[in-house]
UniProtKB/Swiss-Prot annotation:
Record-level GO BP terms: mRNA catabolic process; RNA processing
Protein name in UniProt: Polyribonucleotide nucleotidyltransferase
PROSITE patterns: KH_TYPE_1, S1
MF annotations from Gene Ontology: 3'-5'-RNA exonuclease activity; magnesium ion binding; polyribonucleotide nucleotidyltransferase activity; RNA binding
Reaction(s) catalysed by this chain's protein: RNA(n+1) + phosphate = RNA(n) + a ribonucleoside 5'-diphosphate
Keyword set, alphabetical order: Cytoplasm, Magnesium, Metal-binding, Nucleotidyltransferase, RNA-binding, Transferase
Organism: Bdellovibrio bacteriovorus (strain ATCC 15356 / DSM 50701 / NCIMB 9529 / HD100)
Amino acid sequence: MKTTVTTSVGGKQITIETGRLAKQADGAALVSSGNNMVLVTATSSKKASELDFFPLTVEYIEKFYATGKIPGGYFKREAKPTNDAVLIARLIDRPIRPVFPEGYRHETQIVATVLSADGAFPLEILASLGASAALHCSDIPFNGPTAAVQIARVDGQFVANPTPQQMEKSDMDMIVAGTRNGLLMVEGETKFISEADALAALKFGHQSLIPLLNAQDELREKAGSVAKRAFTAPSIDADFKAKAESLLRPKIAAALSIKEKQDRYAAANEAAAEAEKALLADIADKELLKQRKKELNSIVEDLKYQEARSMILDRAVRIDGRDVKTVRPIANEVGILPRAHGSGLFTRGETQVLGTVTLGTADDEQMVDSLLGLQKRKFMLHYNFPPYSVGEVGRMSGTSRREIGHGNLAERAIKAVLPDFEKFPYTIRIVSEVLESNGSSSMGTVCSGIMALLDAGVPLKGNVAGVAMGLIKEGDRVAVLTDILGDEDHLGDMDFKVAGSPAGITALQMDIKIDSVSFEVMEQALAQAKEGRAHILNEMEKVMKVPRGQISEFAPRIETIKIKPDKIREVIGSGGKVIRGITEATGVKIEIQDDGTINIASADPEATKKAIAMINDIIAEAEVGKTYKGRIVKIAEFGAFVEILPNTQGLLHISEISNERVRAVSDVLKEGEIIDVKVLEVDRSGRVKLSRKALLQ
C-alpha cells in the first residue's frame, strides 16, 4: 500500500513515498522535491556472511532519461559511474554505516537511482534521505533514522538545501548528516571561514535536518512499523577469550609502545603467532580450528583497541609517544623532478606524499558529460594510493572509490587559493603519489600539492595546509588528537580533517564511528586543528613561501590578447579555415572565448609572437590618414578595389589614382599589383575610401 509523507526544509517541500515501487526489496523509498525524484532501495541478505566486518555497499546511479537526454558514446547507454556519482555514493554510505547495530554481518546493498532531475535541488540530499527512509521502514536492523542537508551562506545568512543561483553567491558548500543525538558526517568546502562560523553552520545544519527525521518516523508509523529482524552477532567462547587475553594483553601493550609502524606490526603479529601456537596446537577438529583462529584474530584487534585507548585516556600518551596535540616531525622538498612543471615532497612522520603539477592549455580541460550537461574542469587533482605505501602486495586495477574521495577532498581544499583563470589561463593538474602512509595521506596531498604549485610558479592567493584530527571517547572521558596515525584512525571514534590557512578554513570532512559527537568536542577539534595546520604551514614555508618568479621552461607559455567580440568570426574564418591556418603556420594552440579573450599557447616565444601578429593583422581596422601597402583585387570602370588588410578592402576611385587625368583604370593599374594607398575616409557603414594621388603630391 502506498504511503506518503511531506515535510519542508529551507522553504522547499520534500515528499517521501513507500509501498508503490520496488516492493520486493526489503525497503524502498521514492523521495522527491519539485521535478527531482530519487528511488532508493535497501536489501539485506538473510544469511550472515563469514566476513569480520559489515559488508555494506552503496550504489548511486544517474539515468540520463532523468533529464530527457540520450547518453553519448557508441553504445548510447549509461556506463560506469562518474566520479561525482562515486562521491555521492560515499556521501550516502558514510552517515548510515555507523548506525547499523554492532555485530550485524549480513551483506547489505543500497541502490539510489535518479529518475528525474532539473538541477534545482541537491540530489545527494534526496538520495541520503531515501537510503535512511528505506532502511527505517524495512525489517533490516538499523538504529536510524538519519538525514542530511546541504548548507550555504548567502549575504551572511545560512540557507538549507540552496538553489544553484544561491550557491553562486555562497562562501560555503557543506553537507551535514546526523541523527537527533548529533552529527555523523560533515563534508564541505569554504572560502576561508572562521572556526566559529564553521561551528555555527554545523549547528544550523543539525537543526535543519530534524524535520527530515520526523518525517521518516511518521512514514514508518503510517506504513505499519515493521519489526526489525533478529540476528546473531558473532560471539567468542568465554574460556578461550579469557586464556587468550591473559596471554596476549602484556605482549600487545608492549607492541603498542613501539614507535615505528612496521616494527610495531611485526611485534603484534609475533604475539598473535605465539598465542596461536600455544592455544590452538591441540585442536584436531578443522571447523573448530577455523573458528578459533577467527576468534583469536578478533581478540587481538580488541586488545589493540583497548590498550591504545587506555594509553591515551589514562596516561595521555599516544602509540608513537606523542601527547595529544603534537604534530609528527615534518620534512619538505621542492623541485625534485626535473621535467615536471612543479613538484613537492611532503613527509610527516611515516606519511610521505609526492605532489606534481602539470600546466596545460584549454585543450587539456576535462570534459564530463553529466546529467545536467557538459562540464568543463580547468583544475584536476588525482590521488593515487598504491599498496606498497603501506608495505603490502595488492592489485592495481583502476581508481578506487577511496582514491576518488580523498582526491576530491584535497582538490576542494586547494581550489580556494588558485588564481583566477583570467589572470592565469592554464589548465592545472595535480597528481598525488602516496609513497608511504601512516595516517592522513589526503591532508599530506594538500600540503605536497601546495608546494608543487609554488614550485611550478602558480601565483596562489595564499598557502594552505591540512591536518587530521581524531577522538577517543569513553563515557565522559574525551581526548581530541592532532595529526592522527593510521592506527588512531582505525582504533579511534572520529576522523576529522580540516584544511585551510591562517585566514580561515577551505575544506573539512568528518566521519565518526559512534552514535554522535557533541558540538563541544567539535569546537575543541576545530581549535586544535587551527593550531596544527598553522604549525604545518610554518614548516612548509621554511622551504618555499612564494611562487617561483616564472613557470617551468617545459610548460607552455600562454599570452592573452583581447579583441572585439564581433571580430571573432574573422579570426576563426569559414569552417575554422583562418584559425587553422594560423596554428599550422606557427604551431601554437589558440583558445577563443565568447567575450573576445584569446589565449595563445606555445613553448616557443617567437611562434607566439608571430601568431599574435597574424591575429592583429586579421582584426586590424583601417585608420584615416594612414598609409597601407595593398593588393589590387578588382578593376572597375570607376576605380579599383584594393585589399589593404585581411578582410578589409577599400575603393580607390579613378579620380584618386593619379595627379594626371586617367582615361581607363586598366591603363594604369593591373589586378594583383601591389601599390601604396592612403585612407581618406571610413564611413558609418565601414566603407573605406582610398587615395594614391595623395601620396604622389
